[in-house]
């Protein structure tokens, strides 16, 4: 079967790309053909992307501030975009570039799938995009969603009405967060099959090591005594805590990020590395401090000691969801003067048992979903 997946693969961040790679790998392993639809909105790339971000920031009304923001932000965004475009071409199977709904309507497949990440939430411009609800797909084609996420838990009445209509056209829906299951149930949708794992967790550590990680990158960071910071939100408290934690524990602080401005936040800065080096940094870290959902997923999947700092916005529900699922809610930092979590060792025997059960269930969902088997709600 030919399966084409639309997901948020194009942002310049590691999680978006890694979950896309995992989705293709899993579907191919099930014996099907799979490609990521290379849908890249023009208002999210290059200078237009920076202007879109700027227009959503109400604090930049002053023309000089706007020019300064563009002058600083555009080169950073452009460099990261070039790097990630190169990685996408190297690691990801994609269709030809689609920049509009008209382009998407020309695609053909046996099944279209909405993939993971925050596909059903607002885009950079603040509005949802019906393309991620498969509104371009022909009526006679199967419409599926695996590990889709809303990115938030509250929508206005008009948006809910639109969502209910678009989601009702799907054959089967599986979502990533518990909060999404609650919403679908409240909206009266009957075509959802429950909560599933993020695609990155469908592959275990050894599979990721074989698929992505190069030996020279793994050796490069072996036996290094460091705390790794993977931060995606602008939270000065996180940056300050990580510096104090490293000093308290006597470990080196290493920070990895695709955005150059994080060089100012402390620690040895590794700027926009290849996926192999990124995963090697996680694999070798003694402890990880993160506010990132995928940073959390890979910390758990690689059996690492980690400290979770929830972001100060609605997106934190996805982090909480995977922590609850694996029994690791106690890794959430509640006090920025508390350094005890770095010494509190996680029992990964129990965690891996829970994760393996959920992995098997999720793999069965995606297998049955594509093969058009019957479902029972989980």
Model-derived features: where do they sit?
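A nucleotide-sugar donor-handling region in carbohydrate enzymes
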Residues: 94-106, 120-126, 147-225, 231-232
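Charged active-site motifs of nucleotide-sugar-dependent glycosyltransferases
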Residues: 2, 142, 222-227, 251-252
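Leloir-type glycosyltransferase catalytic cores
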Residues: 325-378
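A donor-sugar binding/catalytic signature common to diverse glycosyltransferases
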Residues: 281-321
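Short beta-strand scaffold positions
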Residues: 114, 175, 289-290
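Catalytic donor nucleotide-activated moiety binding site of glycosyltransferases and closely related
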Residues: 145-151, 183, 232-233, 237-274, ...
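Aromatic- and Gly/Pro-rich donor/ligand-binding loops
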Residues: 3-14, 18-165, 213-214
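Donor nucleotide-activated moiety binding/catalytic core segment of transferases
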Residues: 193-201, 205, 258-259, 263-291
